[in-house]
Amino acid sequence: MDRSAQRIDFTQPADVVAPLLLGAVLRHGGVAIELTEVEAYLGTADEASHAFNGPTPRCEVMFGPPQHLYVYASYGIHRAGNLVCSPDGEAGGVLLRAGKIIEGLDIARARRGSKPADEALARGPGNLGAALGLNLDLNGSAVDQVFSGAGDSSPTSAPFTLTPRTAIPEITRGKRIGISKNADALLRFWVPGDRSVSSPRGRQLGTPLRASS
């Protein structure tokens, strides 16, 4: 269903914000990624969250103002990104698990190498982070919401822009993957059938979710 883009309220809990991000476009450094898979983490109420035990130097950004980026090192190698949500002082975040490159394909490929297929360039949190050019210096960066495809040409000083979706995609929700704690929580959301989504089991074992506007 097509509709006018609506601003996402990042003061809402992560499990509310997460499905709203599917179909939205995140831009940084000449690359635009349409988000196809995300995962919600509920702060101190979620054993799998980096924020479960309260603020630390690593995760303090999650307790700060919403609509900022929390970037962390995964396995000491990859850089993964989360969009911070919930009110200031209450930790919450949405892990950006996968997306498809819609602008800056050559730039993303230069960062990822020649081997991955186009649909795999931003498949998985670390790969998405690499394609988007994430690094730890970007931790805490503001994310501006822009509309009408303004993208990098929009008058904003923020290093990241997010264009909310203008059409509600089909959405599936299911268990989180790649973690051991609270893994059964139905807090992963994805666009069914999209080849950029985690594969193969990441595309399975979910139930349809009626997306809110």
Curated annotation (Swiss-Prot):
Documented EC number(s): 3.2.2.-
Bilayer-spanning residue ranges: none
InterPro entries, per the entry: Formyl_transferase-like_C_sf, MPG, MPG_sf
GO biological process: base-excision repair
UniProt keyword annotations, A-Z: DNA damage, DNA repair, Hydrolase
Enzyme class, broadest EC rank: hydrolase
Gene Ontology molecular-function annotations: alkylbase DNA N-glycosylase activity; DNA binding
Similarity remark: Belongs to the DNA glycosylase MPG family.
NCBIfam families, sorted: 3mg (TIGR00567), PRK00802.1-3 (NF002003)
Name used for this protein in its record: Putative 3-methyladenine DNA glycosylase
Originating species: Corynebacterium jeikeium (strain K411)
Lineage: Bacteria, Bacillati, Actinomycetota, Actinomycetes, Mycobacteriales
